[in-house]
Amino acid sequence: ADGFRDYFVQLTECEPARAAKFGMDHYTWLCINPKEAQDVAFARDVMKLIPEFIDRPNVLGIGEIGLNRNTSHEMTIFEEHLDLAVRLNQLVLIHTPHLEDKLKGTVMILSALKNRPDLDPCRVLVDHCEEHTFPLVKEAGYWAGLTLYPTSKLNPKRAADILELYGMDRVWANSAADW
């Protein structure tokens, strides 16, 4: 987990200093990514580091938490991240799977959130929504994130169609590089 301490220092000290040299502010979220949640003990060790960094001025909250392959280990760590966010009174950024079972993962995430009356939906963003998941997230009362990719996944045309159908209330738009 010490490698993550170095990573969190990079995100909260080095990157803001580097960005400032170019006149920019740098902000970050802190968590252990769902792809790394299969080793629950390791993930818990990393999560123990987060309180040390959470009050840094460039930290936005707990994220990008969620699911990757919709496994029980990922769900365990997701729920423990939610506990941490509530305990530390933090915003939450949630990752939905980039897989053919995105719908299943999104439903699992929304089901877990439904059981959390201690989480204010206005403080939760469910990201990487697509046509079949966007309305579910919006109907549940959470912020819906649209991640735009230049040539794959959710392109600008599809995102515009989603916004035309469902409106722009509680929508977060961001971009990512194609892999």
Regions found by a protein language model. Give the residues of each.
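Short helix-capping segments at alpha-helix termini
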Residues: A20-F22, N115-D120, Y166-G167
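Short beta-strand/loop segments at the ligand-binding rim of alpha/beta enzyme cores
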Residues: L91, L119-R123
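Short hydrophobic/aromatic-enriched beta-strand-loop microsegments
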Residues: W143-P150
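Short acidic/histidine-rich active-site segments
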Residues: D169-W179
